[in-house]
């Protein structure tokens, strides 16, 4: 019993020390001033749901809403001077991606707000606060659908995340020049949640909801990462009217048709990749990079404004796949903000 108590006290002390360290990192910052903050949903459709097997109480047959997208926002004073920025997370994650980093530093959402940008964080449809459609699971549980019809639910293991996010050449061994705060990697693992995108219809409702959100905001810059990295382009091909700019971070690029490229060539586009793309067993990042280079060139050849920002070519080394959480995340945010000012905001002011 004494040993258990001792272990508990050690864990408690470590937790408190971690919290204090995180607070110390934020102590010198000025108060965050907001004009408003809040949340809402975009999209959604009604669907009939049969009562689950063995349901209790009032959980009978009825209607539910599915495919909606949860959005939270923060709007700073003087925000009308800038185009809103919508940030969408990748696989097995939520909009926590953009918030406070695993080691307690400022995330991109707050930094962009402090730079007078209205920021909207979206949870992909079927993920986190957006909810998911349980009907197929209930049908299998009720015996009306065979178990082999259940979709896969992705849940990234620590080992998978380490490899795919390019933290180091082997699990537990970080790159010597790595920018991710490895001492806080356990905090990142806590952010990993089930990915139910395989339950969604095609086209993915997140694309439609992102396009609708851009229209609702009377123009927005759409930013995607990893799984959602090409979502801004997909949203623009559904309805480009509200999309003022596209920022795609570390993703596989799709092959575009001539008409699709023509649509995207009218929207300023930035693609960003980090370091160690040739890492073996880590998600075919070199192939993704090559595909995105071809995409950027396609848009440029069509007369569009597109740029590939490969950080090592800028002399910035060691960035992981989770570059918005890396130790130099604010340096990278400044690169993006500068690109926005030159390629999106400048055109808006003309």
Language model: regions and residue ranges:
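Gly/Ala-rich beta-loop-alpha elbow adjacent to hydrolase catalytic centers
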Residues: 223-232
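The feature captures the conserved acid-bearing segment of alpha/beta-hydrolase catalytic domains
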Residues: 245-311
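Short beta-strand element of the alpha/beta-hydrolase
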Residues: 81-91
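Conserved acidic catalytic loop of the alpha/beta-hydrolase fold
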Residues: 200-221
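Conserved alpha/beta-hydrolase fold motif
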Residues: 222-223, 246
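Catalytic active-site module of serine/aspartate enzymes centered on a nucleophile-bearing elbow/loop
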Residues: 318, 322-350
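Conserved alpha/beta-hydrolase
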Residues: 105-130
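N-terminal cap/lid segment of alpha/beta-hydrolase-fold proteins
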Residues: 24-80
């Amino acid at each position: 019993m004494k040993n258990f108590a001792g272990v508990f006290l050690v864990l408690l002390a470590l937790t408190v020390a971690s919290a204090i360290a995180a607070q110390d990192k934020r102590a010198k910052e000025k108060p965050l001033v907001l004009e408003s903050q809040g949340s809402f949903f975009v999209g959604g459709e009604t669907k009939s749901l049969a009562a689950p097997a063995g349901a209790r109480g009032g959980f009978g047959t009825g209607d539910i809403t599915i495919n909606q997208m949860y959005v939270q926002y923060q709007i700073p004073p003087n925000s009308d001077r800038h185009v809103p920025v919508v940030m969408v997370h990748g696989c097995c994650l939520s909009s926590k991606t953009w918030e406070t980093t695993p080691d307690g530093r400022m995330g991109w959402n707050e930094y962009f707000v402090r730079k007078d940008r209205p920021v909207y964080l979206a949870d992909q449809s079927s993920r986190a606060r957006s909810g998911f459609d349980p009907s197929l699971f209930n049908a299998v549980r009720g015996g009306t659908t065979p178990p082999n019809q259940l979709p896969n639910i992705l849940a990234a293991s620590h080992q998978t995340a380490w490899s795919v996010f390019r933290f180091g050449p082997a699990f537990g061994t970080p790159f010597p020049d790595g920018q991710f705060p490895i001492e806080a990697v356990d905090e990142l693992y806590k952010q990993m949640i089930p990915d139910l995108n395989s339950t969604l219809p095609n086209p993915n409702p997140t694309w439609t909801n992102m396009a609708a959100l851009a229209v609702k905001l009377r123009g927005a810059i759409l930013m995607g990462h990893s799984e959602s990295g090409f979502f801004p382009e997909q949203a623009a091909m559904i309805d480009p009217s509200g999309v003022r700019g596209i920022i795609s971070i570390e993703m596989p690029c799709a092959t575009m048709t001539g008409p699709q490229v023509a649509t995207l060539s009218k929207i300023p586009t930035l693609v960003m990749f980090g370091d160690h793309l040739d890492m073996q067993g880590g998600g075919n990042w070199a192939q993704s990079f090559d595909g995105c280079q071809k995409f950027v060139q396609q848009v440029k050849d069509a007369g569009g404004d597109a740029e590939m920002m490969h950080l090592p070519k800028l002399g910035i080394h060691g960035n992981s796949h989770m570059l918005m959480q890396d130790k130099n995340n604010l340096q990278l945010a400044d690169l993006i903000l500068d690109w926005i000012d030159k390629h999106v905001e400048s055109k808006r002011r003309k």
